[in-house]
């Protein structure tokens, strides 16, 4: 009994002590490793904060310098005399022979380039972008929207022809070089109102990663002589500077009408605008990445000089849709409508003879209005039948237009 108690009082030796020390060391290592990771994360956050504060400090310093610095004069380069000297015309009138900063690329300082001049030495400090008219700047910020070709129903042949004229030369110009032909400069979309001319142009611009200028032709006409022609020049200069670019001119009959000898001063101003447009169309580079799309519902009033090949190489007629096309368009417009039960679209299409795409969209809107009138949150087949009859009765008051090939 005494021997047993003595053995219990003896401390463990050998492997047990080694295992205990190993466990303690391992736990200590894990704690140190966790502390190291925390310190690394804190260091990373501090460095990120330091970088942000450095950027903010630099920005504040630049703002203070810009507030303390003297303004500069805007001028225009007239001629390069030597490698370092240029003749510059200031905005207030006089001309100066000035030097240039070393950091500026002198090859880009061509005639007509806008530059900023130092107030005291008149040295060229930096190159400025081309002056853009506010109206042209507004045109360039026109968003074509996220429209795909599947949103344009019943125009498969017209889409193919338009993509050959606009999309193919921008994506694969080498194909035209190998064949040995000059790519078309632009095309004319003509047809009755509401057939999808503007929608088709927006779909092309949305699918291409390029700049888009939407021009309403009636907005170009100005009461002051020469202003309309200047707007055309600035518009095409902006398009050339921001290639690839698509210029879409809607309602081109506002400035592209047939010229005649008699008329008022306003008519002569519109004719001068048309002549400037003809000049800009002829001035394009053969493989330039600027394409023109024009749209009108009055092709018979356009000037023959505008329609000749070399300016508008392809004329695409967008007529009223046939029965199959009307079915496709109706399904596209009714896709987002909350429907209940089965809708007989074929019966609706048979009652919509002579309808345009805009009329079919109006049918869907009227069907929704009938559902709202009946205090329902969904549209049934009867609503579509009522809507197509209502739109058909309204179309009888419209005058039918005859579109002959251009």
Curated annotation (Swiss-Prot):
Instruction: Tell me the protein's name.
Output: Probable 26S proteasome regulatory subunit 10B
Q: Which organism is it from?
A: Caenorhabditis elegans
Q: Which GO terms describe its cellular component?
A: cytoplasm; nucleus; proteasome regulatory particle, base subcomplex
Alphabetical list of CDD domains matching this protein = RecA-like_PAN_like (cd19502)
Q: Name one GO biological process term.
A: positive regulation of RNA polymerase II transcription preinitiation complex assembly
Q: Which SMART domains match?
A: AAA
Q: Which domain of life does this protein belong to?
A: Eukaryota
Q: Which family does it belong to?
A: Belongs to the AAA ATPase family.
Among the GO molecular function terms of this UniProt record, one is: proteasome-activating activity
InterPro entries for this protein? 26S_Proteasome_ATPase (IPR050221), AAA+_ATPase (IPR003593), AAA_lid_3 (IPR041569), ATPase_AAA_core (IPR003959), ATPase_AAA_CS (IPR003960), NA-bd_OB-fold (IPR012340), P-loop_NTPase (IPR027417), Prot_ATP_ID_OB_2nd (IPR032501)
Residues where ATP binds: 191-198
Q: What is its main location?
A: cytoplasm
Gene encoding the protein: rpt-4
What's its job? The 26S proteasome is involved in the ATP-dependent degradation of ubiquitinated proteins. The regulatory (or ATPase) complex confers ATP dependency and substrate specificity to the 26S complex.
Q: Which UniProt keywords apply?
A: ATP-binding, Cytoplasm, Nucleotide-binding, Nucleus, Proteasome
Xref: Pfam families: AAA (PF00004), AAA_lid_3 (PF17862), Prot_ATP_ID_OB_C (PF16450)
């Amino acid at each position: 009994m005494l021997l047993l108690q003595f053995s219990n009082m003896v401390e463990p030796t050998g492997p047990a002590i080694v295992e205990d020390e190993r466990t303690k060391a391992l736990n200590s290592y894990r704690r140190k490793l966790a502390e190291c990771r925390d310190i690394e994360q804190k260091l990373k956050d501090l460095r990120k904060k330091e970088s942000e504060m450095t950027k903010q400090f630099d920005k504040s310093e630049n703002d203070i310098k810009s507030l303390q610095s003297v303004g500069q004069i805007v001028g225009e380069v007239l001629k390069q005399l030597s490698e370092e000297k240029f003749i510059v015309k200031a905005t207030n009138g006089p001309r100066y022979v000035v030097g240039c900063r070393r950091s500026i690329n002198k090859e880009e300082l061509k005639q007509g380039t806008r530059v900023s001049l130092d107030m005291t030495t008149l040295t060229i400090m930096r190159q400025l972008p081309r002056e853009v008219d506010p109206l042209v700047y507004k045109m360039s910020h026109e968003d074509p929207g996220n429209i795909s070709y599947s949103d344009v129903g019943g125009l498969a042949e017209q889409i193919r022809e338009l993509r050959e004229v606009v999309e193919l030369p921008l994506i694969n110009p080498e194909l035209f070089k190998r064949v040995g032909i000059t790519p078309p400069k632009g095309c004319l979309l003509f047809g009755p109102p509401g057939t999808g001319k503007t929608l088709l142009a927006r779909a092309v611009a949305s699918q291409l990663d390029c700049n888009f200028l939407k021009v309403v032709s009636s907005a170009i006409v100005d009461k002051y002589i020469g202003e309309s022609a200047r707007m055309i020049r600035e518009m095409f200069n902006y398009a050339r500077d921001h290639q690839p670019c698509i210029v879409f001119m809607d309602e081109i009959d506002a400035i592209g009408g047939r010229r005649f000898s008699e008329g008022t001063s306003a008519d002569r101003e519109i004719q001068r605008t048309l002549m400037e447009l003809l000049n800009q169309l002829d001035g394009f580079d053969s493989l330039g990445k600027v394409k023109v799309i024009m749209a009108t519902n009055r092709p018979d009033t356009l000037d023959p000089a505008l329609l000749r090949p070399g300016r508008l190489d392809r004329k695409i007629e967008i007529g009223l849709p046939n029965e199959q096309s009307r079915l496709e368009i109706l399904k596209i417009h009714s896709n987002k409508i909350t429907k209940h039960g089965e809708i007989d679209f074929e019966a609706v299409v048979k009652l919509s003879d002579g309808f345009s795409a805009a009329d079919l969209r109006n049918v869907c809107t009227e069907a929704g209005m009938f559902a709202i009138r009946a205090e329902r949150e969904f549209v049934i087949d009867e609503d579509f039948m009522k809507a197509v009859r209502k739109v058909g009765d309204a179309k009888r008051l419209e005058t039918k237009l005859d579109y002959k090939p251009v």
